[in-house]
């Protein structure tokens, strides 16, 4: 029973230290711009991944990545379109 009480007290102390440490970090104004910059970078990277890259099949130009257009590749019958520069 004593071991359980000690373990509970240690857990409470550790949680208190963690909560105090997190609230102290939120007060630093320099950390927030980094956080927003990270989110913006992440959004840009996700947006970049959603486009179709060079050499991959496409149906319309807007789905291709920037500076690429959906062009016919190969035979004169034009059965395959791919994103090209």
Curated annotation (Swiss-Prot):
Record's keyword terms, sorted: Disulfide bond, Pyrrolidone carboxylic acid, Secreted, Signal, Toxin
UniProt modification remark: Contains 4 disulfide bonds.
GO cellular component: extracellular region
Summary of the tissues where the protein is detected: Expressed by the venom duct.
Gene Ontology MF terms in the entry: ion channel inhibitor activity; toxin activity
Coiled-coil segments on the chain, per record: none
InterPro entries found in the cross-reference section: Conotoxin (IPR004214)
Domain of life: Eukaryota
Residue ranges the record assigns to the propeptide: 24-49
Family that this chain belongs to: Belongs to the conotoxin O2 superfamily.
Domain notes per entry: The cysteine framework is XV (C-C-CC-C-C-C-C).
Protein name (database record): Conotoxin Mi15b
């Amino acid at each position: 029973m004593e071991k359980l009480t000690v373990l509970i007290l240690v857990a409470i102390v550790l949680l208190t230290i963690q909560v105090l440490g997190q609230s102290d970090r939120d007060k630093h104004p320099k950390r927030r711009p980094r956080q927003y910059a990270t989110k913006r970078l992440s959004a840009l990277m996700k947006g970049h991944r959603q486009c179709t890259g060079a050499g991959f099949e496409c149906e319309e130009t807007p789905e291709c990545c920037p500076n690429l257009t959906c062009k016919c590749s190969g035979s004169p019958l034009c059965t395959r379109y791919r994103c090209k520069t």
